[in-house]
A protein has these predicted regions:
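Conserved N-terminal entry element of GNAT/NAT acetyltransferase domains
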Residues: 1-19, 169-175
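Conserved acetyl-CoA-binding loop-helix of GNAT-fold acetyltransferases
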Residues: 81, 86, 92-105
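Conserved GNAT acetyl-CoA-binding A-motif
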Residues: 105-118
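Conserved active-site tyrosine of GNAT-family acetyltransferases
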Residues: 125, 130
Length: 178
């Protein structure tokens, strides 16, 4: 009888991951999402990664990168969650919950934790205490602030005492700004 290799959680900064490890994470993203772009990949780099691995297989991943968001006239240090995925054949086993618990543990390092999700992810994140931002969203572009109405309702924040009905503005980046 073959004993399955137990899964384990690995936390590492992007700079601590090998090219092989990053390649495995990228392969996971491509398998999990039909439309994962180079910009999406770039957004998940430069911060802390949580990986659930077994042997040399990456079962699940998520990262937190530092961004700036404007709320109530103040620039907040935001831990922004990116690239959360579980291998399609490994879903439903708690791997994404392991990843999120590790990433949520980084909250004390930031003023605010946020993410943007699809409708399919709303219940998962909501069950973990993430709340929808109810106010209008926008992005600070090189040409000024522009509304991002397609993101309204998709932006979630980890339980925080901010006014969730206030306008929220993120910093500029290529690809999906939220």
């Amino acid at each position: 009888m073959v004993t399955p290799t137990p899964s384990r959680l690995v936390m590492a900064h992007t700079g601590e991951l090998t090219g092989e490890e990053l390649g495995a994470v990228r392969a996971l993203m491509d398998a999990a999402f039909d439309d994962f772009t180079e910009d999406d990949w770039s957004h998940g780099l430069g911060g802390m990664h949580a990986l659930v691995v077994t042997g040399d297989e990456v079962l699940a991943h998520g990262s937190v990168v530092m961004r700036r968001v404007l709320v109530a006239g103040r620039s907040w240090r935001c831990g922004y969650v990116e690239a959360v995925a579980t291998a399609p054949t490994r879903r439903g086993k708690g791997h994404a919950s392991m990843v999120m618990a590790a990433l949520e543990g980084l909250a004390p390092a930031y003023d605010l934790m946020a993410l943007s999700t699809s409708p399919a992810g709303q219940s998962f994140y909501g069950s973990r205490g993430w709340q929808p931002w109810r106010g209008p969203s926008s992005v600070m572009t090189p040409h000024g602030t522009e509304p991002t109405p397609d993101e309204d309702g998709a932006i979630l924040v980890l339980a925080h005492d901010l006014d969730l009905d206030a306008p929220i503005t993120c910093d500029w980046r290529d690809g999906d700004v939220w």
